[in-house]
Amino acid sequence: MGASISYDDAKTNGFNGSTSIYTGDFLADRKMLTLAHFNQDGAIYPAGYLMPLGFPRPSWGKWEARNHAIVDVHRIASESAGYCYSSRVIYADREHWNGNWVDLYDSNKKLWKSISYYNDAGDVPGLGSAWDGVASAAMDFQNSHETVWCGFGNPWKRKPWLDSNVPKEYQDGVKYGSPSGLMMILR
């Protein structure tokens, strides 16, 4: 079995590389239909998804036409030999700069995978409207396989806690942010 997402894919903005070995080309600006503000109550797998495609049901929230920059990110020539992807076309939301959709092309420039990133935007203390959660579906067209993943698929349907949203009991930096503190927790 396995997953349709590789380490290079598993980043919520659609790109997990560095500018030292990658370059990119701007392709276009487009309005795209996306789910940017949603209710994670619908994110229960598989009931909250339109199967077998793994798309969110309407109960997740309202789809909106949002401004996107479309860019082609690829390795620089000296680093491209032997790399699995020749091109990564990212459809990035112009407000939050997250890749909401990524098309990945194999070394022969054939479409291999498409990955949807449903990046939820919410009120983040000190930042305002920013990314605060993600769900994803990766379709591997060459191997007829799909991986559906949701960060809200927990029994409490919680998004990550950020900054002052973190409950007081978890704001102990020594207990939760040091080896000695983690050793106390693991006892």
Each model region followed by its residue ranges:
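Flexible, processing/modification-adjacent segments and terminal tails
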Residues: 1-67, 78, 170-187
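Gly/Pro-enriched, hydrophobic low-complexity segments
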Residues: 1-15, 62-164
